Every structure is written in structure tokens, then in C-alpha cells.
Amino acid sequence: KGGWAGQTIGVAYGGPTEFRYRSAMIQDYVPISYADGCIKNYFKHAPGLFDDIYMDLTFVEVFDRLGIDAPVDSFAHAFAHADYGLWHANQAARYNILNGIMPPASGHWLNNPHADDIDYQIEADFAGLMTPGMPNTASEISDKIGHIMNYGDGWYGGVYIGAMYSLAFISDDINIVVQEALKTIPENSRFHQCMNDVIQWHRQYPNDWKQTWAECEKKWNQDIGCPEGTLLPYNIDAVINCAYVVMGLLYGEGDFYKTMDISTRCGQDSDCNPASAAGILATIQGYSQIPEYWMKNLREVENLNFAYTDMSLNQTYQTSFKHALQMIKRNGGSISGDNITIVCQTPVPVRFEQAFEGMFPIGRQEIRKELRHLGSFTFEGTGIVFTGYIRGAKNYVAQVEMYVDGKIIERAVLPTGKNHRVDLFWKYQLPEGKHIVTFKWLNPDSNAQIHCNDALIYSNRPLPIPHQ
């Protein structure tokens, strides 16, 4: 119950700052509002703010309808056919699923340039809340559902968040929860190394979260996958954003406000990060320990359904508790009246996987042209992503062939509306060298536009520094 309440409050607290501070912290002199009635106001006028929660609830509803052994395709179809809009890895996965690329291929980086993004990380709360004290069972759930939209570090973010929620039920020591949950992540992964660095920096600078933030920026604020943020200040990568969650938990020292505030002031995805931190902390401490200052606004919405769902917070509390009891019994525990026995699990690492291995972003080339006027595009490297968008009639679906060096790479279908393709075209794993890209629009429409913004170019080695 505390987990769902905490993340709802965290989203509302950080919401006004989301991605307004990119590669920059929110300084202490910048006020962050939490006005009376603000959560209810968001429910009515900005329900999309709670996307990370109603995404969770999509999966919770499938478990409730089909049982705890529901097949992955059921989750994939529920997610892909939902009425809400999606972004980044989630939207790329929706497109893939609707075009026959099912999980886990729908989240694989070769099919999803956003595979390392934060998407499953902000949706994985349910996996830990339904597996109290059983982090490995949470990881099994994350293996199935997290690979719908993510891979590698993007998947690890959800595995780690789920494990922290799971362990939050059996330990009231935040440091233990953070450290033990990290044992679910392979030590040789970037994700593990970054979280471990944050833990070590916290020990080195126990009273200065801003120093840890600066160390983290220096070493880990590099995104190589997301076509919207790579080589730009915008970073929606799971690694850096989960570091901000951990910073809030460690430096917050069990204080609800301080935990949320630090995760928010780290910047970037500054509503989802405090939501994760506050949800985990409220799971450790319990619903009844959330300060009244924060609960006053929450109580106004506990009986209101989240957008795009038939579930309110009060219903979610009950449903999530029911699923947790089922998982406890499934994994050897027992229930006798009010007495519940959990067979606790020692965390073990999931398998190692890494996206974009051996790839180095070396430049973004501005295009700013419609596809019909682009002609050919020449670049040197091993991979390329074309960003942009399509506009046209509601039911229009463009069909475009992409060629590299005269060989067809794909015939892309480009729908308009909520089923759109996030990135227009991409091709990785080309031999290093000069390549020529051309396109053939098979069904042009005078009322449709396919606009290319820019091209993100990759090589198999870092760009040499030209001024040395």
C-alpha cells in the first residue's frame, strides 16, 4: 500500500520539473510546489503525468484477469492496444508488437533504438510489490515483462527497482535494500558499476549529495542509444536516472520529503525518479508512516480511477495485496489468518546482456527536409538513425523502402497517430566505411509529410579529438 501511495505522491511532487533540467541539477533556491489539491488537479487536467503508474496497472490488470502465470503475449497486447500515448522504448515496442515483432524481440536494441531508456524502470514497481521478500521471483517477472520494451541496461533498471521494492518488505535499512538489490544485476554491466559507484561516493561524501551528483555526471552521463538524447543534454537512459533514485534513497536518510526532493533535484526524468524513490521508501516504512502533509492531497484521489484504467488507488492496494499473497504461496510461503510466512530469497544476478556493444556515436547531422526532397544521404560509420515524424490523414500508412549502398534494408510502414514509429529509419552493424542511404516512398500522398529532422551516426571507434 505504501509503495503505490509513495510513487503517486512522488510523481506529483516532481511533475512540474520533468525534463526541464537536463544535465543540470535543480538548485536549492528553485522552489518546487506541492499546493493543496495538486494531485486531484493533475488527475483531472494532466492525467498523463501518471503514465508510469497506469502503465504498471496495465500489467496488474492482466495478472488479475489471467492469473499469475499469464503469458507474455497477453501483457504485450494489452500494452500495445491500450488507449494511452507512449514514448521512447514503450512506443517503439508498441509499434513492433502491432507489426508482428513480439517480445523479447520487441525490446531488443536491434529492433528498438530506445532499449536502454528508462521505460521499464518506471513501470517495474508492481513486480516487487507482488513479490515481498522474493527478489528473484521479481526478476523472473521482469524477465518476461521488461523485455517487451527494453534490453540490457534498460531492462536492468526495472530488475533493480523491482528487487528494491521486494527487499523493502523485509528490511528497514535503506543501505541494505540498495546494496542487496544490486546483487540481482551482473557486476560487469554498466548499470551495476554506476550504482556501485553511487554507493561508494555516498560513503566518501556522506553529507554532500551534490558532490556525488557531480561525480556521477562526470563518469556516467553518457547516452549512446536514445536517438532523441544521444550527444545532447537530454538523457532518458536508465543508468543515470536510476543513479538519481539511489541518491535520493541514500542521502534522504529515511526522510520522505528529503528522499523525494533529492531525486527530483538531480534533474532529467525528475518526476519518475522521485516516484521510484518515494515508493521504495514508503514500502520500507509503511503507508501509515507517510507524513500527513503529503497524505492530505493523496486522500482526495484514492477513490478516483487512474486515466485509461478501471482502477483507483484503493482498488490497487487490494489487488496488489492479493497478488502478493498468491506469490507468497506459490513460492513456498504460508498464510494462516493474519499470520503470513514468507520464504525469503537471497538475490542472485540475472543474465548479462548489453545493447549497442562496440558502437560509438560520432555525430548528429542536421537534415530538416521532407523525405521526398532528401535524395541520397552519405555518411561514414557503422550505423545510422534517422529521426523525424510523419503527418497525414488519420488512417494513412506510408510505405517506404530504405536502401544502404543499393541494397534494400527494410520496407518500413509508417502510420500516423498513436501507433507511429518513434524513429523513422535505422540500420546498425554496417561495416566501417562510407555508405549511401536512399529511400523509395512506395505510396506517396500529396497530403502526407515524412519529415527528417537529423541523422545520428555511429562508428566502431570513438571520434578522434581534432584539435590535439
Q: Can you describe what each PLM-predicted range is?
A:
Residues 48-50, 55, 60-159, 170-171, ...:
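Active-site cavity-forming subdomains of large catalytic enzyme subunits
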Residues 97-98, 105-115, 124-135, 143-148, ...:
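Accessory "access/gating" subregions that flank catalytic or transport cores
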